[in-house]
């Protein structure tokens, strides 16, 4: 049995990191979160632009906030509310605690003494949580506890040949050992619906796959017009890609060859599902990563051909570069990428050898090795899938 050393949480789930998160219940409290970060080095501040005045989308934000804060990579949460926003911060905190069992401390500026008092109390509580987190010890757990999130961004013509198949190799390995893999970016599955539906575990799952991809294609055409299939990002074109369909055939390689067990809406909790699962979500990288983490991914793997350096604040994100030119242009072995998948082309490495290299690297990361985005502090912010970010 394959095992790794993780942090077992009160609800039985396992984290690969041990963070104390400080987050605003609505974006009007972001400044307070930043003050707490300055007072208490070691906490992870989560900055966002949500929490109020988003009619029709608030249920999604509430789900994401609770999902993110319940991820087992977090030891404890400091939640700061203003008081006049749509949801009560203390009620949200109680929900997070019920789901995760983790320590949660919530304060409301308009009820708990104003900004300075809340900053002081939250800072004191954050220090206690950091001390508690420092007492946690990693324990040996089976790989079946892993939820592995996959992502690609800034793709080029080699992404579907080198980096994405390497992630697919890792995905198949995780599934074979009882774990869970998340494949997303539905806009980048357009044209592959029959391929993916053919891998579905049941006719019902196949129908879900076709539905989400066809719905996404209609949305893309609404925004981009009848030539939508030819419109891809400028960087993708510069990297040698030509159409959404070509890009999609490379994108889905991140899911390997395993049977697709289910389809989830954006950021919905994984709730014990095993095997390969599609999460409905956009191609926009920070939004996609937020959804993967909310669903339950403790570790992420992100391929790039053009050299996107983005990570995620609360999860290790292994950056795999599809080509050696970009890898060395961005610093090489001491630069912005974790793994050079271009070695398949320039060094004669076989695809399976690259895949095993990625497996070995991921195992080190699960056991505590920092990824490049973690070392460089390139976590980014929370971004949520909404009507304003449809693709």
Residue spans of the language-model regions?
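Metallocofactor- and cofactor-centric catalytic cores in central/energy metabolism, strongly enriched
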Residues: 1-391
